[in-house]
Amino acid sequence: MLYLKRKIDAFLSEWKENPDKKPLIVKGPRQVGKTESIQRFAAENYTSVITINFVEEPKYKMITADGYKAADIIKNISRIDPSKRFIEDETLIFFDELQEFPDIATALKFFKIDGRFDVICSGSMLGLNYRKIESNSVGYKTDYEMFSLDFEEFLWAGGYDDAFIDDMLTHMRTLTPFNELEMSVCGELFLNYCILGGMPAVVREFIEKGTFEGSLETQRQLISDYREDIRKYADGMDQTRILNVFQHIPVQLAKDNKKFQISKVASGARFRDYRGCIEWLNDAGMVNICYCLNFPELPLKGNYDETKYKLYFADSGLLVAMLDEEAQEDLRANKNLGVYKGALYENVVGEALVKAGYQLYYYKREDSTLEQDFFVRTASALIPVEVKAQRGTAKSLRTLITSDKYEDIHYGIKFTAGNVGFSDDIYTFPYFCAFLLKRYLAGEQSEKL
């Protein structure tokens, strides 16, 4: 089976080399490749790998019966399976499906103190168990959050190397337009990524076949699996509410005003009744929440209204798959999704920002037409980010930059179908450069220091 190179690969290697490393918890949505990446790393770096999957082998939930000390847990694992070999300094213990047995997180402190074996846990943050994991292991773990493939990892899967990606970043930093061939190649690759998304099963199938055949079916199976997870892990009556919110995301993104309106989900629905449902979907890694700023100024944290927000899919390919039967074909053939076109590009850029480490914020002033898609920040500036599905003047972006009201804003970023450019303090880049924004801004900051 084709292995997809992931960013976690380099992180795992660095983690192993750290002499003072803590047990590692790899979190992330279902089916984004956590187990596969960890198992590959383990096989290449350890003499012995002890894999405990709490879903496939629930009997291992008994290993804490005598307490949480490393020696007691190792003894109980050996009682269940005497063939497992624990070799000091050469063994990785891999606890998979952590959400099924969050109790094991309590043992991480004792494995850190013991120090003889490396420990990695992996789990999907479904239901309330992730909070139990946090409280059980605070101070004695390292966290890594994994997502579906970003566009850079998608390029790796297609055989493009770091030099290709570095060249894209150079175009941004030097404000050098891409030539016709580069625009065509990068644009087609990005369109493929928009259609497919980054779920490993979908990307692998596309790379191996070289066509979109079967991709829609795979995406829809993933959506079906997500719905089943909601039914399995969500409590009681929240199941129906969570499913209703999940189903309504594409419809609400198609509106001119993309603010998510709970009142559209069910008759008489109120935010306070659905707040936990929104948080559940976000914590499970199924959606990204974009909160409305009270005012576009620093700092961002605490400066937003939690009752006003947009909901984006954490993987844009799943958004496409939830549209009508012709959506994928229409996007490939006509490059046109009608009312959904703007929603798709917003979703893809928002997804890229989250995968780069940003939290999502937007701004809409109630008494005017002023509205801005996203905001990111550097150490000293607030940067509005515009996503234009069609060529336009970006009036809100210009207002934010030129008005004296917004002291933290000095320039803006616009992502479009067009080429690299700069005018009136607005930097314009193609959509396919969105994944590089954080690196671009880091370079801008270092030049000013």
Per-range role (PLM):
Residues 118-124, 145:
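Structural recognition of the conserved hydrophobic beta-strand(s) that form the central parallel beta-sheet
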Residues 26:
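Hydrophobic anchor at the beta1->P-loop junction of P-loop NTPases
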Residues 37, 41:
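Hydrophobic positions on the alpha1 helix immediately C-terminal to the Walker A/P-loop
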Residues 34:
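Conserved lysine of the Walker
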Residues 1-15:
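N-terminal pre-Walker A segment at the start of P-loop NTPase domains
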Residues 199, 204-379:
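Accessory nucleic acid-recognition modules appended to NTPase machines
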Residues 132-254:
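Interdomain motor-coupling "hinge/lid" segment immediately C-terminal to the ATP-binding subdomain
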Residues 56-89:
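Short glycine-rich substrate-engagement loop in P-loop NTPases that contacts/grips substrate
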